[in-house]
Amino acid sequence: MSNRTALLGKKLGMSQVWDENGFFVPVTLVDVSTNVVTAVKSEESDGYKAVQLGYGQVDPTKVTKPLAGHFAKAGVTPRRHLAEVRTDNAEEFEPGQELTAELFPEGTLVDVTGTTKGKGFAGTIKRWGFKSYRRTHGSHKNERRPGSVGACATPSRILKGKRMAGRMGHVTNTALNLTIVSSDVENGVLAIKGAIPGPKGSIVLVRSAVKGA
């Protein structure tokens, strides 16, 4: 574990900017305003060090009493989304502290975690990239079938992990080592180079890169 900083945000969409060499660079815009520390975990009280973040406003009348007490203890208004990030420097934060895009200046490498777009039930060709059968003589209604899924008597079952048709997407995914192209502290917007998981309006967690240089 290292001194990792993080912000919760909402994916606004994609755009493009010019770089210093005159090339278009695709960027994803993420709104990271209204981030606040709602709790700080320590080894003495919790057995590990971590910081809990809150993001987004929510109607106070729609918050459960336990959560309302949790937010009141931190001295903040109720937040819609919460996330916990383990870090060695958790003692440097305090409940109620507001966090801004200033945490990630231009050029910083970050990891972005989000939920991918859900595609619904999909076959093996779309889900796993299987090759289709040839559409020619002797092949009858087999074009998109998965083929054999295992032996008959031995092991007399389908092995766990077999790639088959099923629900595709809507899973947690992390894009590693993305570069912060610009950090707009005033408006609370980060421009991150490349694409990040999830559709527009989805909630993402931006953390300092764990494998970055």
UniProtKB/Swiss-Prot annotation:
Signal peptide residues on this chain, from the entry's feature table: none
Record-level Gene Ontology MF annotations: rRNA binding; structural constituent of ribosome
Keywords, in A-Z order: Ribonucleoprotein, Ribosomal protein, RNA-binding, rRNA-binding
Cellular component terms per the entry's GO annotation: cytosolic large ribosomal subunit
Residue ranges of the TM segments: none
Gene Ontology biological process terms, A to Z: translation
Assembly: Part of the 50S ribosomal subunit. Forms a cluster with proteins L14 and L19.
Family: Belongs to the universal ribosomal protein uL3 family.
Free-text function comment from the UniProt entry: One of the primary rRNA binding proteins, it binds directly near the 3'-end of the 23S rRNA, where it nucleates assembly of the 50S subunit.
Protein's UniProt name: Large ribosomal subunit protein uL3
Gene: rplC
